[in-house]
Design a protein with these regions (language model features):
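Short glycine/acidic-enriched loop and turn motifs that connect beta-strands
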Residues: 459-463, 526-531, 589-592, 638-642, ...
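Blade-edge motifs of beta-propeller repeat domains
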Residues: 432-440, 472-502, 541-565, 596-615, ...
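Basic/polar, cationic surfaces and motifs that engage anionic cell-wall
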Residues: 143-185, 191, 195, 203, ...
Length: 878
């Protein structure tokens, strides 16, 4: 129950009821609250609020008494930062017509108002409403106020997602060693993998058929307070952050109403510019302010059924049952029998991310799978509101045929969901129809705080026994103070530390047990088994968020065990589309070997070549290369003849199969992402040595586009140091492309490529700094990679700490990953030869205006606690 108190003349404060979860232990808990300040009458109907001190808040919304009245002019607000004491510039606040209808739309508690605007932590406010000429606008509605929304602190993390817990109908399955291989090491941690009733694409009961893609026109059923029975879906439920987990108030003003089914999905955006600069680490707080906004407008609860962010997090919106046809308040006249999904951001200006689009498609597919709906079909809906009321474009009782996935603008006079998101609705529908749509969403977030996390492997540490350091991402990048070091002697890690194990030689993130937290796969290719097979190799999987339970396994099938070195490279993705990620591993021994382990332990394995010698430079990348919804794998290696190769493995309902070697030569590194923005993941191959790839003597990177058949050379692009607009020049031994990573650093919707050049020399003062190293960032475009706008970074770059020195090997490993949650991939760069062979990792953030050189941070062995001579910066994940 919310406590109501007067807090000075004209100010009303009420606290939103806290969820039952305890407050975050890392900081003093603060309950959410809303502080209401009445705007002052300035004569002739003009209203505003002069600068004044306030209680703490992070968002604002303007409201007024009459829900049908409209504010005159443009509402604007500016706020004072609680830390710096500086006042912001004026922010425009968009008026938002009410979207509730039916009984909820007739409530006396409804108020007119605006959308809420995120301000960040503030303690001062000023409000004005201005005309086009800059003067104060007259004729404002009565009862106008500004509500200061304080989201409080996040509830404590680590709660098991109710979405998955609710699906458990049997005891969790225990991972067991592969039964066909008696030499497989026993799993030491007795892990469990979440059992769900919807793992299989086969429905548990027959869904309602739709007959044809277009339903006949019929009046929309009246909503009912009766709670219908949940329906099973043909699609596995995606991981959803529940209301309890994001800290929703349960002080609902009423009870939910229900339709009879879900017929369509309506896609929205929050439409606020400040949401574009929000970190995904702040999305839970933003959810609480959106709920506060909707409460302030008089809604029963948050109006949307689901909300997603640019990192692909999915949030439960309106209460009443995620698997039920809950009537929302998101599209007046069309709230019944639709599911409303809002994307945090203003997509009139921002571009939607691949992760955000995939998250929407997963929700659509799951909800539609309950009713046998084709996401790419059409539906005829009947308007339940008079034309012109709150923007509704369709007269009461009139039918309109719409795509099953449509935008708010299709039925309402609004730009929502924005000029950049609206054209993506067809792709969302197509993705929702793919056979592998039940796939686990890609994640590198082990603590589920909304921000991807970094792994620095040091397999050469401690006499090559190996260690691994997990560094959580944060609002300012990797948080070294919160690091976790894992060895084979760490609590819960299977096995024991031994010289030569090379624990941490490879690592990969993914949600293996389907609980929403990223789990960590770790390679130890030098591990010996207990049956006398030296260097057989081992893969260890540790469950997030604690990373203190897990399991291990080794080679299986007919692969020669001795010298296999399984775990030399790893990739994690949902190869069979069952909602839980699977693990791919490869080893160098006896012509090379590979192993794909599905959830539950079923394993497929084989050899890469028929040679008896060892292959080299294994590197794996996963992505959906043919856009069928199943994760695929591209594996780079150098064969025994010294030639680089890339072999494609295709995902399907039965798992991963070896499709064959592609025509483009391999190199020493590989990465995946959608470079040309067409929805197919592409690969970028690092080809640093000419004799292996047939490329330039100093090295190159080659982007190979994904296609419905796997890969195509049509549209293939190559970047090297002699490419137009690339700084520097080709020199033998530069090792351009020795490491490579793919990510969207400028949030333009095209993945970019980051290439390490650890062999680059830097002459300084007449002295050549040999193998000092640097990196090149090449931009992605609709036609592939380009040298135009490319950026070179070294330790001699202005603002970057340190200096280029002989043997630093800057660029020995690279990661182009968003470690701050702002939707732009940051640069994380390894220099394993820095400070002798101690090594460093340098973090360089990507800002809205470019790279933040002055915010670059070096993480040394002191900061990360790695041993001396550990070669920190040799491997980075993701």
């Amino acid at each position: 129950v919310g406590a109501v108190a007067l807090s000075g003349a004209g100010i009303v404060t009420y606290a939103i009821a806290d969820p039952s979860a305890p407050a975050d232990a890392k900081q003093e808990g603060r309950a959410p609250a809303v502080h209401t300040l009445k705007l002052k009458d300035r004569g002739s109907g003009r209203k505003g609020l002069a600068k004044q001190d306030t209680d703490r808040f992070s968002a604002v919304v303007l409201t007024w008494t009459d829900p049908e009245a409209r504010a005159k002019g443009t509402p604007e607000v500016r706020t004072r930062d609680i830390e710096t004491g500086k006042w912001s510039g004026w922010q425009k606040i968009t008026a938002e017509p009410g979207q509730a209808d039916g009984e909820e739309g007739a409530r006396a508690a409804l108020r007119g108002g605006t959308e809420s605007v995120w301000t960040g932590d503030s303690d001062g406010v000023e409000v004005r409403l201005v005309s086009a000429d800059g003067t104060e606008a007259a004729g404002q509605p009565a009862g106008m106020d500004v509500k200061l929304l304080d989201p409080g602190t996040d509830p404590e993390g680590g709660i098991r997602p109710a979405a998955f817990a609710a699906e458990e109908t049997t005891a969790p399955a225990t991972d067991t060693p592969v039964p066909t291989d008696p030499a497989t090491p026993t799993e030491t941690a007795a892990p469990t993998e979440t059992a769900t009733t919807t793992d299989s694409p086969t429905p548990t009961e027959e869904p309602t058929a739709t007959g044809t893609p277009t339903d006949p026109a019929s009046p929309t059923a009246s909503p009912s307070p009766t709670v219908p029975a949940p329906r099973p879906s043909t699609v596995v439920r995606p991981p959803v952050i529940t209301q309890a987990e994001w800290g929703a108030s349960t002080d609902y003003d009423g009870t939910p109403e229900y339709g009879t089914e879900i017929k369509a999905a309506v896609v929205h955006h929050t439409g606020v510019n400040s949401d574009n600069s929000l970190s995904c680490g702040q999305s839970r707080a933003r959810m609480r302010t959106i709920q506060q906004e909707h409460f302030a407008r008089g809604y029963f609860d948050i109006g949307y059924n689901f909300v997603v962010d640019k990192c692909g997090q999915i949030f439960e919106g309106r209460s009443g049952g995620m698997d039920l046809p809950v009537r929302g308040a998101h599209d007046v006249g069309f709230n019944t029998d639709t599911v409303g999904i809002s994307y945090i951001g203003n997509f009139e200006s921002a571009r939607p991310s691949r992760a955000g689009l995939d998250a929407i498609a997963r929700i659509v597919a799951w909800k539609f799978g309950m009713y046998g709906i084709d996401p790419t079909g059409k539906v005829t809906l009947t308007s339940g509101m008079d034309q012109g009321v709150d923007g509704n474009k369709i007269p009461m009782g009139q039918s309109v045929t719409l795509p099953r996935v449509f935008g708010h603008r299709d039925t309402n006079s609004t730009a929502c969901p924005g000029a950049n998101l609206y054209p993506k609705l067809t792709r969302i529908a197509q993705t929702a129809k793919t056979p592998g749509i039940s796939h686990a969403l890609a994640t590198s977030d082990f603590n589920r705080d909304g921000i991807d996390d970094l792994v620095a492997g040091t397999p050469r540490a401690l006499s090559n026994g190996g260690t691994l350091t997990v560094v959580p991402g944060g609002l300012d990048g990797p948080v070294a103070a919160a690091r976790r070091t894992l060895t084979q002697n760490s609590t819960g890690v299977p096995g024991s530390h031994e010289s030569g194990d090379n624990f941490g030689a490879a690592a990969a993130w993914g949600d293996v047990n389907g609980d929403g937290y990223a789990d960590l796969a770790i390679g130890a290719p030098g591990e010996d088994d207990t049956s006398g097979h030296a260097d057989r190799g081992q893969v260890v999987v540790m469950y997030g968020p604690a990373l203190n339970t897990g399991f291990s396994y080794t080679t299986s099938g007919s692969v020669t065990a001795t010298g296999a070195r399984l775990g030399s490279t790893l990739a994690v993705g949902d190869f069979n589309g069952d909602g839980k990620a699977d693990v791919f591993a490869a080893g160098t021994g006896r012509g090379g070997n590979w192993n794909a382990r599905l959830t539950g332990g079923a394993t497929t394995s084989g050899t890469l070549t028929t040679a008896t010698g060892a292959v080299a430079y294994l590197d794996a990348a996963t992505g959906d290369f043919n856009r069928d919804g199943y994760a695929d794998v591209a594996l780079n290696y150098r064969d025994t003849g010294g030639i680089g190769r890339v072999v494609r493995f295709a995902g399907s309902a039965t798992g991963l199969t070896k499709a064959g070697v592609i025509s483009v030569k391999g190199g020493r590194a590989i990465a995946a992402g959608d470079v040309n923005g067409n929805g197919y993941d592409d690969i970028v191959i690092g080809q640093p040595v000419a004799s292996e790839s047939g490329g330039l003597s100093g090295g190159q990177i080659t982007m190979v586009p994904g296609a419905s058949t796997g890969f195509t050379t049509t549209g293939m692009t190559t970047i090297h140091q002699d490419t137009a607009n690339v700084a520097g020049g080709n020199e033998s031994g530069d090792l351009f492309g020795a490491s490579v990573s793919v990510g969207d650093y400028n949030a333009d919707g095209f993945a970019d490529a980051l290439a390490g050049v650890p062999g680059e020399d830097f002459p300084r003062g007449g002295v050549n700094q040999s193998n000092a190293g640097d990196v090149l960032l090449a931009k992605g475009t609709a036609t592939g990679l380009t040298g135009t706008g490319s950026i070179r970074v070294s330790q001699d770059t202005t603002g970057v700490p340190g200096s280029a020195e002989t043997g630093d090997l800057f660029g020995s490993a690279v990661s182009l990953t968003d470690l701050s949650g702002y939707g732009r991939a940051d640069l994380t760069l390894g220099a394993e030869g820095e400070d002798g062979t101690d090594g460093i990792v340098l973090y360089l953030p990507s800002n809205s205006t470019g790279l933040g050189y002055t915010q670059a941070v070096i993480h040394s062995k002191t900061a990360l606690g790695t041993p001396t001579d550990a070669h920190l910066g040799q491997t980075l994940t993701p």
